[in-house]
Amino acid sequence: MDFLRNLFTQTLGLGSQKERLLDELTLEGVTRYMQSERCRRVICLVGAGISTSAGIPDFRSPSTGLYANLEKYHLPYPEAIFEISYFKKHPEPFFALAKELYPGQFKPTICHYFIRLLKEKGLLLRCYTQNIDTLERVAGLEPQDLVEAHGTFYTSHCVNTSCGKEYTMSWMKEKIFSEATPKCEKCQNVVKPDIVFFGENLPPRFFSCMQSDFSKVDLLIIMGTSLQVQPFASLISKAPLATPRLLINKEKTGQTDPFLGMMMGLGGGMDFDSKKAYRDVAWLGDCDQGCLALADLLGWKELEDLVRREHANIDAQSGSQASNPSATVSPRKSPPPAKEAARTKEKEEH
């Protein structure tokens, strides 16, 4: 194995010196880079962790995650609820769950509005999201700003490929909340929201945007994702080798051995702690607090006001101040832990 590792390292240049664009592998270093002329195009890669403060569970947390709370649906295993083969035979569990998680019942979080600020300041190249809650759209991102890698509730289609009739979000919502399994008006087969189930291909837009975006990205900001689901997880390796990557998450993730990653076709993983680390920064903690800390360092004082204003608008439109109370601006932890879990060994080794 060591022989192969050395051979591939030399052949693929895995051990060669890379250009370092961050003067410090901390959130402060990322901030200074974002304020420089070198950083003009930012891609955000986001997962369920950016929506948990809105009251939407993530998938894999041991006690609070979605997979840990599906016993009432009597599934053969938790992931079956999102498998297309199981859905076609037993759609009822999915639609029961969909009623609980349906878009429109939750407000965007601080993370969502931070991404909107990136757009307003001309920095956002694209937001790639694994989420199907549509909160990026509610926060103000346009379809062209987004790659909804795992699909969306905005449209639905008949699962009968010879039919394929399209249905609107309002049509699907009416069916779900009437507790009726949505059936095609044309052929009576089940109608499924256009979210990507296990066993289905990702939308073509995912691959077309991936080809055009990552060759020119200046910074990756990765938030609230375990980076365990392919091919989304492989996006971290699509950026140029010099491009800095900031992870805002509860734990470090995406750390794949470069040699094994290349052998498996996943690309090089993230490196936060080794002596060769040169572009990856991890901020560990609540995603909203991480965005607040970064916004503070950037001088973007308007973030919290934006969240309050937009939440008030949503409440006014819904006619209820009680809707989604968990999504209000979370209390700031003082001071913002701007350096928390950024590569702390840096000064010891230099």
Swiss-Prot record:
Q: What induces it?
A: In oligodendrocytes during differentiation of CG-4 cells.
Where does this protein have compositionally biased stretches of type Basic and acidic residues? Answer: 340-350
What are the catalytic residues?
A: 150
Name its co-factor(s): Zn(2+)
- Processing and modification events after translation: Phosphorylated at phosphoserine and phosphothreonine. Phosphorylated at Ser-330 by a mitotic kinase CDK1/cyclin B at the G2/M transition; phosphorylation regulates the delay in cell-cycle progression. Phosphorylated at Ser-330 by a mitotic kinase G1/S-specific cyclin E/Cdk2 complex; phosphorylation inactivates SIRT2-mediated alpha-tubulin deacetylation and thereby negatively regulates cell adhesion, cell migration and neurite outgrowth during neuronal differentiation. Acetylated by EP300; acetylation leads both to the decreased of SIRT2-mediated alpha-tubulin deacetylase activity and SIRT2-mediated down-regulation of TP53 transcriptional activity.
Q: Which InterPro entries match?
A: DHS-like_NAD/FAD-binding_dom, NAD-dep_sirtuin_deacylases, Sirtuin, Sirtuin_cat_small_dom_sf, Sirtuin_class_I, Ssirtuin_cat_dom
Q: Where is this motif: Nuclear export signal?
A: 4-14
Q: Where does the entry say this protein is expressed, by tissue?
A: Expressed in the cerebellum, cerebral cortex and cervival spinal cord. Expressed in Purkinje cells, oligodendrocytes and Schwann cells (at protein level). Expressed in the central nervous system (CNS).
Q: Where is the composition biased (Polar residues)?
A: 315-331
Activity control summary: Inhibited by Sirtinol, A3 and M15 small molecules. Inhibited by nicotinamide. Inhibited by a macrocyclic peptide inhibitor S2iL5. Inhibited by EP300-induced acetylation.
What's the reported outcome of changing residue 131 to A? Reduced deacetylase activity on alpha-tubulin and stimulates oligodendrocyte precursor (OLP) differentiation
Keyword Nucleus present in the record's keywords: the answer is yes
Swiss-Prot/TrEMBL keywords: Autophagy, Cell cycle, Cell division, Cell membrane, Cell projection, Chromosome, Cytoplasm, Cytoskeleton, Differentiation, Meiosis, Membrane, Metal-binding, Microtubule, Mitosis, NAD, Neurogenesis, Nucleus, Phosphoprotein, Transcription, Transcription regulation, Transferase, Ubl conjugation, Zinc
Q: A biological process (GO) annotation for this entry?
A: peptidyl-lysine deacetylation
Quickly give the catalysed reaction.
Answer: N(6)-acetyl-L-lysyl-[protein] + NAD(+) + H2O = 2''-O-acetyl-ADP-D-ribose + nicotinamide + L-lysyl-[protein]; N(6)-tetradecanoyl-L-lysyl-[protein] + NAD(+) + H2O = 2''-O-tetradecanoyl-ADP-D-ribose + nicotinamide + L-lysyl-[protein]; N(6)-hexadecanoyl-L-lysyl-[protein] + NAD(+) + H2O = 2''-O-hexadecanoyl-ADP-D-ribose + nicotinamide + L-lysyl-[protein]
Q: What is its EC number?
A: 2.3.1.286, 2.3.1.-
Please describe the quaternary structure of this protein: Interacts with CDC20, FOXO3 and FZR1. Associates with microtubules in primary cortical mature neurons. Homotrimer. Interacts (via both phosphorylated, unphosphorylated, active or inactive forms) with HDAC6; the interaction is necessary for the complex to interact with alpha-tubulin, suggesting that these proteins belong to a large complex that deacetylates the cytoskeleton. Interacts with FOXO1; the interaction is disrupted upon serum-starvation or oxidative stress, leading to increased level of acetylated FOXO1 and induction of autophagy.
* Further comment found in the protein's record: Has some ability to deacetylate histones in vitro, but seeing its subcellular location, this is unlikely in vivo.
- What's the protein name? NAD-dependent protein deacetylase sirtuin-2
| Species annotation | Rattus norvegicus
